[in-house]
Amino acid sequence: MQPADPGEVTVLLQQIGHGDAHAVERLIPLVLHELRTLARLQLRNERPDHTLQPTALVNEAYIRLVTDQARNWQSRAHFIGVSASIMRRILVDHARRRQALKRGGLSRRSALDTENCAALSDQQAEELLTLNMALDRLEEMSHRQRRVVELRYFGGLSSEETAEVLNVSPITVKRDWLAAKTWLKGQMRHQPAG
């Protein structure tokens, strides 16, 4: 299946931003394949026998995307970037629920119910939470570098697409990507999840 025409997707996103509810119905078939690919990217480090499937992640992200009252997507790349951010937050919430179950407590339920918490091993949940804490610290130092990581690593966007979303040059994205990766590697080595 070919990816959707970026121009057509951008037009639909702009129509959605102007309140056209029918544009959402036309958009989803055009981006569903990309969202599933993005979900597979997000789940690539999970155990092979996990119960959390890309479809469940796409469905949860879709619910959050369409209920977001402040949606103002400028382009296909921006939409995919926002989708990646939402999917990452869903996985972090999922890891937190897994840790809460492990300790005997349970936070609120979502479409990714507690049965799916078994999809993450204890180590994977801990690593995801450690990465999330490191990204929070990176945010304090450089919002743009955190966004570059989110868009490149979690969103699978190229340097050029990331530059478009962030309104910077591709060389700036490449510099930020290198700096952020180096910094995060150091943080991941020295910080246990808390």
Range-by-range predicted roles:
Residues 2-4, 18-26, 38-58, 170, ...:
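Short, charged helix-capping/linker segments at alpha-helix termini
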Residues 14-18, 41-48, 60-78:
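Sigma70-family region 2
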Residues 32, 55-63, 76-96:
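Σ70-family region 2.3-2.4 aromatic/basic alpha-helix that recognizes the −10 promoter
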Residues 41-44, 88-106:
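Arg/Lys-rich amphipathic alpha helix in sigma70-family domain 2
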Residues 57, 62-68, 104-124, 131, ...:
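Internal acidic/polar
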Residues 139-159:
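Short amphipathic alpha helix immediately N-terminal
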Residues 155-175:
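Helix-turn-helix DNA-binding module
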Residues 181-194:
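Short, Lys/Arg-enriched C-terminal cap helix and immediately downstream tail that follows
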